[in-house]
Amino acid sequence: MAPERRSRLSETAGLFVSLLALTSIVPVQAVATVPQTDYAKRAERVLRSAPLIDGHNDLPYAIRKSTRDQIYDGKLPFETSLKGHTDLPRMRKGRMGGQFWSVFIACPSDPNAPIDLPTFATRDTLEQIDVARRLVDKYSKDLMFCDNPGCAKRAFRQGKIGSFLGIEGGHQVGSSIAALRQAFYAGARYMTITHNCDNAWATAASTVRAGKPDLGMTDFGPALIKEMNRLGMLVDLSHVSHQSMRDILKVTKAPVIFSHSSAYEVSKHLRNVPDDVLKTVAKNNGVVMVTFVRTFVNVDDPDSVDVNTIVKHIFHIAKVAGWDHVGLGGDYDGTTELPKGLEDVSKYPYLIEKVLEAGATEEQARKLVGENVLRVWTEVEQIAKKIQRSGALPVEEVWKGRNGTALSERSTFIEGPAPLAYGCD
């Protein structure tokens, strides 16, 4: 080989080695340039690396109340500014990576109404699923409808906000497992077992707050949980009574979520989760998503609540259950009682700053903002696939206390000659 060629090769090799060394050093230097005490930049780094997924937002119900689910007439400026807590610019400012939209419909106004009182709740729930999905479709440049955790991760990689649906109360499906199944097929991926009323499956926390006994889960409850486990639908224990929490955790085969609840030991409100349940949630591999409602997080002095109150709840749950079992579920647009510093969805980066300032590592913060709930959702799906592969069929059990002729009256269709008419002319 000619001397000049050897010289050029040597120079090229030396340059390559130098560049290789430089590339191995620069990222380390770039990371090191963010001081540990620069919590804003560290929070930004967390939110770039993990999707911030909120467990509960009531914007679809706010749309129903304000526009009767009309979103195409120009009266819902979601892309610019809405009066409530949530719109697209504020979601972007809040660095949100995913949102469980609640397709909420209220319990009957009479707290003493029979559980099987005929209502329009199931119809209205389908309308809320419809408007939520139409909203996501309308703003598909920024939002992506997802019904599985893989899609949620893909949305984050594409710079979109994953949008998922949750039903807030078993009354919304008429205490019917078949109706629940259809809601799942329509895209709902969690159901809160009760809202502020008992149903055929469990006792609500609001019932106990009203001075009535905590009867926990009903005899029909295990059938519901069995079907939700089979489907791969997240079991949400926010709003249920403390005994209902304990009973359901005994029968579920999959991790549970609390979509918007905080720590009972910090604030003695029955909507919060007691320590013994937090420990069981850890064994169950579930997640408690901390809510921001002032009267929940400081029952004694709600006016004093600020972002540090929420940090206190987060750290208590992390201490009792572990950092693998805590998340965020603000309840934006479902309450007017929000902490100072967390007035709308744009404030999430500030919360993460405060969590880091209080001593959490960035790894712990990533778990908090979204990795935990995605892990739970993934495990719920894996368990469902295993159950389905075992040959488990859809649950057909019907609540014995239900009204309605077709299922509550026995006919001779199977046992003897069919009648000439079934009364369905």
From Swiss-Prot:
<keyword id="KW-0378">Hydrolase</keyword>
<comment type="function">
    <text>Hydrolyzes a wide range of dipeptides.</text>
</comment>
<feature type="binding site">
    <location>
        <position position="271"/>
    </location>
    <ligand>
        <name>substrate</name>
    </ligand>
</feature>
<feature type="binding site">
    <location>
        <position position="239"/>
    </location>
    <ligand>
        <name>Zn(2+) 2</name>
    </ligand>
</feature>
<keyword id="KW-0482">Metalloprotease</keyword>
<dbReference type="InterPro" id="IPR008257">
    <property type="entry name" value="Pept_M19"/>
</dbReference>
<dbReference type="InterPro" id="IPR032466">
    <property type="entry name" value="Metal_Hydrolase"/>
</dbReference>
<keyword id="KW-0479">Metal-binding</keyword>
<keyword id="KW-0224">Dipeptidase</keyword>
<feature type="binding site">
    <location>
        <position position="56"/>
    </location>
    <ligand>
        <name>Zn(2+) 1</name>
    </ligand>
</feature>
<feature type="binding site">
    <location>
        <position position="260"/>
    </location>
    <ligand>
        <name>Zn(2+) 2</name>
    </ligand>
</feature>
<feature type="binding site">
    <location>
        <position position="168"/>
    </location>
    <ligand>
        <name>Zn(2+) 2</name>
    </ligand>
</feature>
<feature type="glycosylation site" description="N-linked (GlcNAc...) asparagine">
    <location>
        <position position="403"/>
    </location>
</feature>
<keyword id="KW-0732">Signal</keyword>
<keyword id="KW-0862">Zinc</keyword>
<feature type="binding site">
    <location>
        <position position="58"/>
    </location>
    <ligand>
        <name>Zn(2+) 1</name>
    </ligand>
</feature>
<dbReference type="Pfam" id="PF01244">
    <property type="entry name" value="Peptidase_M19"/>
</dbReference>
<feature type="binding site">
    <location>
        <position position="195"/>
    </location>
    <ligand>
        <name>substrate</name>
    </ligand>
</feature>
<keyword id="KW-0325">Glycoprotein</keyword>
<feature type="binding site">
    <location>
        <position position="168"/>
    </location>
    <ligand>
        <name>Zn(2+) 1</name>
    </ligand>
</feature>
<feature type="signal peptide">
    <location>
        <begin position="1"/>
        <end position="31"/>
    </location>
</feature>
<dbReference type="GO" id="GO:0070573">
    <property type="term" value="F:metallodipeptidase activity"/>
</dbReference>
<feature type="binding site">
    <location>
        <position position="331"/>
    </location>
    <ligand>
        <name>substrate</name>
    </ligand>
</feature>
<comment type="similarity">
    <text>Belongs to the metallo-dependent hydrolases superfamily. Peptidase M19 family.</text>
</comment>
<dbReference type="GO" id="GO:0006508">
    <property type="term" value="P:proteolysis"/>
</dbReference>
<feature type="disulfide bond">
    <location>
        <begin position="107"/>
        <end position="197"/>
    </location>
</feature>
<keyword id="KW-0645">Protease</keyword>
<dbReference type="GO" id="GO:0046872">
    <property type="term" value="F:metal ion binding"/>
</dbReference>
<protein>
    <recommendedName>
        <fullName>Putative dipeptidase MGYG_00085</fullName>
        <ecNumber>3.4.13.19</ecNumber>
    </recommendedName>
</protein>
<keyword id="KW-1015">Disulfide bond</keyword>
